[in-house]
Amino acid sequence: MIGRIAGLLLEKHPPLVLVDVNGIGYEIDVPMSTFCRLPGIGEQVTLHTHFWVREDAHLLFGFMTEPERVLFRQLTKISGIGARTGLAILSGLSVNDLHQIVVSQDSTRLTRIPGIGKKTAERLLLELRDKISPAITLPETGTAMASSTDKDILNALSALGYNDREANWAVGQLSEGVTVSDGIMQSLRLLSKAK
């Protein structure tokens, strides 16, 4: 599986981008939320990716942040929501917007997205309701987990049974320069208070 792509941005044609990694060009589908934040042609870019295998195609989907990729994966597990619809949702709504929609059970905002009818919107809200806790707010889509300390803390929280959304939220609350052990302890305290 390809989880991350880092390389030179060669082309941008919505919704596709072409990224050169050591002489190999990867064509990646991205939501408009990611497309709008891409650097210029010829600059370095890093995308969190999801590798999608179908009978007729192998596709890469790219996201500027980990929370966007996590949400894309949750969306595409819902019956009736394929990869293209998942991209359309993330193109029209930020991670936090979708979180608020799920918490408030506001299906009308979802039906404004192309490809989402009333029944699909209601199914999406039903499926995501148990996965998104109202006590936990997701980090802004502009934040990215980049440091090795953050990754070590995320891995530890994952090993302790926390899902990606909870772990990313907790790490996003930590102060800069925290050690791995202190970060794990602080994250556990935050997560226990949020439940």
Curated annotation (Swiss-Prot):
Gene3D superfamilies recorded: 5' to 3' exonuclease, C-terminal subdomain, Nucleic acid-binding proteins
Molecular function GO terms recorded: ATP binding; four-way junction DNA binding; four-way junction helicase activity
Top-level taxonomic group: Bacteria
Transmembrane regions listed in the UniProt entry: none
Region (Domain II): 65-140
Chain spans, region Domain III: 145-195
GO cellular component: cytoplasm; Holliday junction helicase complex; Holliday junction resolvase complex
Role noted for this protein: The RuvA-RuvB-RuvC complex processes Holliday junction (HJ) DNA during genetic recombination and DNA repair, while the RuvA-RuvB complex plays an important role in the rescue of blocked DNA replication forks via replication fork reversal (RFR). RuvA specifically binds to HJ cruciform DNA, conferring on it an open structure. The RuvB hexamer acts as an ATP-dependent pump, pulling dsDNA into and through the RuvAB complex. HJ branch migration allows RuvC to scan DNA until it finds its consensus sequence, where it cleaves and resolves the cruciform DNA.
Subunit structure: Homotetramer. Forms an RuvA(8)-RuvB(12)-Holliday junction (HJ) complex. HJ DNA is sandwiched between 2 RuvA tetramers; dsDNA enters through RuvA and exits via RuvB. An RuvB hexamer assembles on each DNA strand where it exits the tetramer. Each RuvB hexamer is contacted by two RuvA subunits (via domain III) on 2 adjacent RuvB subunits; this complex drives branch migration. In the full resolvosome a probable DNA-RuvA(4)-RuvB(12)-RuvC(2) complex forms which resolves the HJ.
Domain notes: Has three domains with a flexible linker between the domains II and III and assumes an 'L' shape. Domain III is highly mobile and contacts RuvB.
Name under which the protein is recorded: Holliday junction branch migration complex subunit RuvA
Organism encoding this protein: Nitrosomonas europaea (strain ATCC 19718 / CIP 103999 / KCTC 2705 / NBRC 14298)
